Amino acid sequence: MRSYRSIFSPATAQERAQNFEDYWLYTRQNDGEIIEDQKDLTRKRELRARFEAKAVRSRKPLADPECFYRNCVKMQDGPQTLDRKTLLLTFLYKFARHEWVGISAAWEATAPMAESMRTTQRISRYHLSEEFCHIRLFQEMFRTFHLDRVEWVPLAPWMQRIYSIFPLFPGELMSPPAFVSELLGLTVYLHLDKALDDILAQEPEAREHVRQLLREIMADELAHVGQRRNFLGPVGLRVAKLIVGPMYRTFFRDLPEAKFLFDIDQMVRDGKGFDYSLIAPELLKRSWVPSYCRA
């Protein structure tokens, strides 16, 4: 059995350069061709069509769907008053909304494929297209629970501004928080995957449909973590390790549902101690891991 190392394992500049080429090969094989004007990818589109052809709908719709719509953008009711299924879905919306805002800003700031001369530029365009595909999978999760009126809306103006200027930072400044952001996303998905068994215990069909959608996202996100790690030199890696805790806690403070669903302290520990050996083998087989994180 293959063994793995920590995501914070050191790497030489030469190793990182080769890993960018390896990742570029992997992502093209995994995604197919980019459909740039639609922020889509051919193989992801085919996958989505298969999910939609075998769509599952909850046998027990939310008791009060309007409670979801009322609280998904901003929590209007006390989170402790929401049932756990609704709480999970309002959290998922808020989390995905941050993703949508961030990738929308980054898309405008990155060069289109026709102007992308470097491998890292082409990787970034594919990466963002994958993230837009994830947003479409989130939509299918909501439809699983008969929530057909979900729309993505902007964040508060000051937060929108932060997301809009972040992609303009020099790489040395942007790379550590960009890496930690990907690590945070993967941490959320891993904890969410575990929570499904409890929260959706009475709905096995819906639970497994959501889990399949989630694991498609997780396979990509696992690769994104390695890819973003590859942008970090020794100094950037040290900075990233220092900001895991502050970034995680700051992010979750903006999502009031989080502390009612997850152990935030454990999520921080998982981020700081992330090791590929803790990931399920079937997920690792479908994803990409930097060579310097493989023993």
What is the meaning of each model-derived region?
Residues M1-A295:
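Non-heme di-metal
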